[in-house]
């Protein structure tokens, strides 16, 4: 249970750390961000208070997803209606938090009063952003057991396409939910990318079954898989026989900026549903159990560092708990008690059959 609580908390910590960078327009390069952090005394001396270190829309939407998942729904359609209600309820809080534009657009299309079609939104050519990935980690907490894979796939796809009805967007939510479930299962980190790609055809099959936007999806489906396959080959972990990620000899903050931009589809690392989880995963592979190193790689770069920080922080919490993280980063965190309560509730529900 403690690690589930840590996952919810540290996702929010990663969000707050990364969001502060996104807000500082002048700090657009990882090297500069890290130098600034050192001048202020480093991570050990930071206290994340809500006034100084607010969370972004990533945490607000993640909390909304978790709240829906911890209600007493008796079928998945009821869960989706509850998600719609939660998202519509909090959407007015989002504009001041610099949200992924597709999140706002998607929430505007939700129909809480339409019982049958509440969560059916139109295909969105611009719905490929990171916002689906950053609100879905808790789905992996709720359905982490291997025998719940089918449910995890369905819920993460539906949750994702409520706001990001585009394969690059909603496959991001599948990816983060799967990574969280793999962490909870104790699966070796180096296998996660391969096993996630093996689940993508199951998501495609589910989308075909639900007969929504199949033609539009087909056109964009390949992009997500191709980007991830390329990444796994670059790190030499695409085959089952490969069990150690290989990094370049020189992979400092400046080189990482270039690499993150290369992975992106528009030159801003972490902007889309494929590369926000990718940067977080890359950071976890390189950082091991070092929270500081994780922050340098996932929370302090010139791209969408709030998105990558949210995903990386959540996964780190589930893998390693809170012991390796300075207390000041979470003791006064915005919505701390709510996040801990949701983590505990998700743990309890995930261990009961439903």
Curated annotation (Swiss-Prot):
This protein's GO CC annotations: sarcomere
Positions bearing Phosphoserine = 27
User: Which molecular function term from Gene Ontology is one that the record holds?
Assistant: magnesium ion binding
Q: Which domain of life is it from?
A: Eukaryota
Where it mainly occurs, coarsely classed, is cytoplasm
Which keywords describe this protein according to UniProt? Cytoplasm, Phosphoprotein
SUPFAM superfamilies xrefs: ADP-ribosylglycohydrolase
- Sorted alphabetically, which Pfam families does this protein's record hold? ADP_ribosyl_GH (PF03747)
Please list the disulfide bridges: none
Supply the Gene3D superfamilies for this chain: ADP-ribosylation/Crystallin J1
Protein's GO biological process = cardiac chamber ballooning; cardiac myofibril assembly; protein de-ADP-ribosylation
- Name the InterPro entries on file: ADP-ribosylarg_hydro, ADP-ribosylglycohydrolase, Ribosyl_crysJ1, Ribosyl_crysJ1_sf
Compartment(s): Cytoplasm, Myofibril, Sarcomere
Q: What does this protein do?
A: Required for myofibril assembly and outgrowth of the cardiac chambers in the developing heart. Appears to be catalytically inactive, showing no activity against O-acetyl-ADP-ribose.
In the record, the note on similarity to other proteins reads: Belongs to the ADP-ribosylglycohydrolase family.
**The protein's name:** Inactive ADP-ribosyltransferase ARH2
Q: Which organism is it from?
A: Homo sapiens (Human)
């Amino acid at each position: 249970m403690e690690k589930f609580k840590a996952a919810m908390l540290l996702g929010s910590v990663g969000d707050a750390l990364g969001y502060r960078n996104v807000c500082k327009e002048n700090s657009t390069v990882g090297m500069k961000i890290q130098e600034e952090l050192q001048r202020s005394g480093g991570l050990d001396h930071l206290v994340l208070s809500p006034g100084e270190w607010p969370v972004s829309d990533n945490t607000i939407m993640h909390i909304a997803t978790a709240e829906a998942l911890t209600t007493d729904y008796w079928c998945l359609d009821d869960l989706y209606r509850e998600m719609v209600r939660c998202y519509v309820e909090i959407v007015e809080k989002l504009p001041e938090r610099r949200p992924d534009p597709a999140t706002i657009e998607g929430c505007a299309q939700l129909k809480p009063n339409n019982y049958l079609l509440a969560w059916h939104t139109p295909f969105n050519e611009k719905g490929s952003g990171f916002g689906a990935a950053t609100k879905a980690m808790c789905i992996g907490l709720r359905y982490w057991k291997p025998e719940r894979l089918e449910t995890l796939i369905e819920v993460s796809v539906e949750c994702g396409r409520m706001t990001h009805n585009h394969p690059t967007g909603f496959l991001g939510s599948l990816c983060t939910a799967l990574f969280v479930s793999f962490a909870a299962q104790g699966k070796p980190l180096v296998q996660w990318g391969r096993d996630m790609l093996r689940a993508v055809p199951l998501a495609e099959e589910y989308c075909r079954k639900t007969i929504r936007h199949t033609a539009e999806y087909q056109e964009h489906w390949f992009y997500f898989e191709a980007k991830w396959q390329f990444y796994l080959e670059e790190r030499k972990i695409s085959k089952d026989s490969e069990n150690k990620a290989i990094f370049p000899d020189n992979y400092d903050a400046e080189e990482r900026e270039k690499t993150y931009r290369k992975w992106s589809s528009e030159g801003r690392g972490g902007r889309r549903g494929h590369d926000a989880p990718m940067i977080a995963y890359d950071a976890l592979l390189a950082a091991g159990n070092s929270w500081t190193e994780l922050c340098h790689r996932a929370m302090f770069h010139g791209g969408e560092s709030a998105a990558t920080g949210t995903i990386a922080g959540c996964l780190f919490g589930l893998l390693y708990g809170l012991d390796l993280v300075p207390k000041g980063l979470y003791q006064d965190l915005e919505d701390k008690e709510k996040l801990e309560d949701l983590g505990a509730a998700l743990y309890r529900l995930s261990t009961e059959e439903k």
